Regions:
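Short beta-strand micro-motifs enriched in acidic
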Residues: 31-35
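A short, small/polar-residue-rich loop/turn motif at beta-strand boundaries
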Residues: 1-28
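Carrier-protein-dependent adenylate-forming modules in NRPS/ANL systems
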Residues: 25, 36-77, 91-266, 274-277, ...
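Conserved donor-binding loops in enzymes that form glycosidic bonds
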Residues: 179, 247, 288-289, 313-314, ...
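Short beta-strand and adjacent tight-turn residues that come in two discontinuous sequence segments
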Residues: 200, 312, 337
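Short, Asp-centered acidic motifs that coordinate Mg2+ and/or phosphate
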Residues: 188, 196-197, 283, 332-334
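Active-site beta-alpha turn of Rossmann-fold NAD(P)-dependent dehydrogenases/reductases
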Residues: 154-155, 246-249, 282, 288, ...
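Conserved AMP-binding/adenylation subdomain of ANL enzymes
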Residues: 256-285, 292-333
Length: 340
């Protein structure tokens, strides 16, 4: 119907007054309108739940995302951080260092402390150092080095730690492979990552029968490295070098490799050690799949602090009662439990 202006109600003078409720209807609401051929974003939020700086940051990212969409960029190519937000200062004590440097420092301080334990046994920091040196030398002799990727297929065993530490000592990045993946997916990941080297336990050799690159059997490392000493100079990684490549689930298409540099990994290690106060007395459990980036939270920090890394056996990971008992029996002090 029509709207009629009036200035009296019941014979008394009346005047319209706008009233502001000064209250957000929801914790956060975003409205988009067009004004003079421009998109206008308005954010309404509850001040008792969010800081103004947080909302400004959200608005900035919305602007970047909207601009990328209007330029018809692919979603994965849109950077949601301004350049000044993409770097984080390292602890001055660790400036210019990488995980490899911090691990070697831990070996010097705690050579005989247990470093990694799985369902079948454990190895000390000295043993992990020697075994990973062996892996690194074999990779180096194959021409492996910085900015190169190596696949790891060994299930949830302590050999996984031997492998990824060895790969990083040789300067490269590791690509975790899950033995439960279809062979076609493993083949795609190895080809897409350009991995010319593969570290595998004999149990899973059939899964990679197609592979024509360099293969190192992790089953032989423990015995072969007993009296081993390095005879080549390793190319240690620099902070700007690639640390790992973990592939997405591929639920919306082909899996995509997500890459992280050593300096980013070091920032995460420092954050975990600071917030969890990781010490040599800790037993840190690794629960997440190695092919899920949540695994990185627990794989690295303990091995820079002299703590023990415990790898949950695959056969109990999906049994909540067994997991709870394992936590108690192993005296776990820290762990990350993402959804399965």
């Amino acid at each position: 119907g029509d709207n009629f202006a009036f200035d009296t109600i019941g014979g008394e003078y009346a005047q319209e007054e706008p009233i502001s409720l000064n209250a957000a209807k929801a914790p956060v609401s975003i409205s988009i309108s067009i004004d003079r051929n421009k998109f206008v974003f308005e954010i309404e939020y509850r001040g008792d739940m969010y800081y103004e700086d947080t909302m400004k940051y959200l608005a900035d990212n919305l602007e970047i995302a909207a601009g990328g969409i209007l330029r018809e960029q692919e979603p994965d190519d849109i950077k949601l951080l301004f350049e000044e937000k993409t770097t984080m200062e390292n602890d001055p004590e660790h400036a210019g260092k990488t995980f490899v440097d911090l691990f070697r420092e831990a070996v010097e301080k705690y050579p005989d402390r247990p470093a990694v334990r799985d369902g079948k046994g454990e190895i000390t920091y000295r043993e992990l150092d020697r075994m990973s040196d062996y892996v690194a030398q074999k990779l180096t002799e194959n021409g492996f080095g910085r900015e190169q990727a190596a696949g790891i297929l060994c299930g949830r065993t302590r050999e996984f730690a031997v492998a990824y530490v060895g790969v990083m000592k040789a300067g490269g990045a590791y690509v975790p492979l899950d033995p439960e993946y279809p062979q076609s997916r493993i083949e795609y990941m190895l080809k897409d990552s350009g991995a010319d080297n593969l570290l595998v336990i004999n149990q899973y050799r059939e899964l990679v029968s197609f592979y024509d690159g360099n293969i190192l059997s992790l089953d032989e490392v423990a015995e072969a490295s007993k009296d081993f000493t390095l005879s080549v100079e390793l190319t240690s990684p620099k902070p700007e070098n690639l640390a790992y490549m973990i592939y997405t689930s591929g639920s919306t298409g082909k899996p995509k490799g997500v890459m992280l540099e050593q300096r980013n990994l070091l920032n995460l290690i420092e954050y975990i050690r600071l917030t969890r106060k990781t010490s040599p007395d800790d037993i840190v459990a690794e629960f997440a799949s190695f092919c899920f980036d949540a695994s990185v939270i627990d794989l690295f920090a303990p091995l820079t602090a002299g703590a023990l890394l415990y790898i949950f056996p695959e056969d109990i990971r999906k049994d909540a009662v067994a997991v709870a008992k394992c936590i108690q029996d192993q005296k776990i002090t820290s762990a990350t439990f993402p959804t399965q």
